[in-house]
């Protein structure tokens, strides 16, 4: 018999997970000396990285992708990413910006 899950319990569980994620935001050099912002530490099994990347790209007006368990954004967006992730429900105290 399949386990019946209350949708409200599942939503609360996801909110608690969001608040416990340790997220690291840093910049890497890409091709031709360009910069890219890397966001690591979001559990890709529990959260849709593609959806989070899509929201961040729209807010930051930049290109990017979600691959290998991390989000890559074109350009240096470290200063704004922390605030935007907090707006999406992630704990601001657990977001480390380098």
Curated annotation (Swiss-Prot):
CDD domains the record matches: YciH_like
InterPro entries: DENR/SUI1_TIF (IPR050318), SUI1 (IPR001950), SUI1_arc (IPR022851), SUI1_arc_bac (IPR005872), SUI1_dom_sf (IPR036877)
Gene Ontology biological process: formation of translation preinitiation complex; regulation of translation; translation reinitiation
GO MF assignments: translation initiation factor activity
Family per record: Belongs to the SUI1 family.
Species this protein is from: Thermococcus kodakarensis (strain ATCC BAA-918 / JCM 12380 / KOD1)
SUPFAM superfamilies to which the protein is assigned, alphabetical: eIF1-like
Name assigned to this protein: Protein translation factor SUI1 homolog
Gene3D superfamilies associated with the record: SUI1-like domain
Protein biosynthesis keyword on record: yes
């Amino acid at each position: 018999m399949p386990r019946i899950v209350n949708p409200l319990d599942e939503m609360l569980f996801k909110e608690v997970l969001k608040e416990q994620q340790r997220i690291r935001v840093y910049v890497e050099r890409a091709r031709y000396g360009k910069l890219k912002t890397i966001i690591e530490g979001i559990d890709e099994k529990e959260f849709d990285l593609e959806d989070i990347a899509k929201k961040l790209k729209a807010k930051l007006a930049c290109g990017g992708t979600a691959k290998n368990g991390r989000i890559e954004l074109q350009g240096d967006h470290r200063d704004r990413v922390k605030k935007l992730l907090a707006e999406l429900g992630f704990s601001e105290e657990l977001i480390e910006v380098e």
